[in-house]
Amino acid sequence: MQCIRTILLLFLTVFSTSLIAQTRIQSVHQAVKGETLHSLSEKYGVTIADLLSVNPEMSSKPNKKIKKGYLVNIPERKTKTPVFVVPQDTFCVAVVLPLTTAGKEGERSLEFYRGLLMAADKEREKGRVVKVIAIDEPGVKKGVVEVVNSLLEIKPSAIVGPLYPQHFSAMSEVAKSLNVQLIVPFSSKVKEVETNSNIHLLNAPTAVVQELSWTLYSALFSKKRCVVIKTKDATEAEVVNHWVSNLKNKGREVKTLSSNFTQQDLLNALHPNQSNVIVLDGSNQENVLSILNKVREYTNDATTHSISVVGHNAWQTFSMEHHKLLGLLDTHILSQDYYNAHSKQVIAFEEAYHQWFKHYPLQLHPRMGELGYDTGLYLFNAQRENSLKDATGKDINYLQSILKFQKLGYGGYVNASMMFLRFGSSSTPDIIE
């Protein structure tokens, strides 16, 4: 494992050298016992000189055996020699993301990829044969013809990617041609999922989220008086409006307030003898906290009012100092994932991540490393169940994203996981599914 940690750091370093600008990288190979540059040159149809041009740190020992687990950059082929074909007993995941791109896109893609690598390493510890191949996704202006050709020759067991919407169509076609699953990790706007059963979306489309969230909302709150408070940002208005429409269709009364409501406005909207649920349609922290503090202040003496608050996924990013307020208002945050910074499993993962890559995870929500790791767990579990289409994902100890895929009509699959994070007196919320 130590050697993997070392070479994964070199992976990023090597990508940044000027030599790579001259000889482009096509993929990354994780060495197995006994491999040499000579054997890799034969396997991938490239010259040793080309291998050394993208792996300059190996130039002093070209004939020496490569350490098991070492990541070797594989350059683009200058000939038509066939690339390495995955053995039948190997479950191979091809990751097509912009791993070398500067800025947020590259950083997030790289961290996701690293998390998936860690899941693969965990799988190997169980004696299973898995392989992760990295293919650098080109920019939107370059197209993915070379990437598609590589995938058709490699014949992976599953593909993860791409990032850019301009590449969805081509990647959808190659997944269909190979009859393998295409896991799109970031975007929810992939129209091909409606017709291609090979596609899996980690982020469900808005229409699916609306239905999933309504099912969960109605199970908990449909009999309570709903009071919607409009925020200045209104980033969650589509989902909230869907709930309101369904409630009105069922004959339920819904009250609506603007963000500058007075105490009397709020008390008039709340039902004095019935449970109430206050729903905000935004996620901007400043706006939300301003409203929640007003709600707490205005109802503090109104002991006859029973109140719960419903919020949204981005509220998870609120700092710990605000969790007490969320608990006092019986806040339920709607989400498809949950990052628990206090979890021993999460802490151990992030410590291992730092040891491997000499970097701390990006402070984002959701966490990219955990997302990649959870995706890997799902994929490798699906391998054992022999089908991504039939995989249940049960009994997997996910770090952050509970993946539960459901079929979308005659098309592909979308992540149908949905939960409420209920904040109370505890330092961590209860999960309600």
What are the roles of these predicted feature ranges?
Residues 109-111, 127-190:
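Beta-alpha junction/loop-to-helix N-cap segments that form part of ligand/metal-binding clefts
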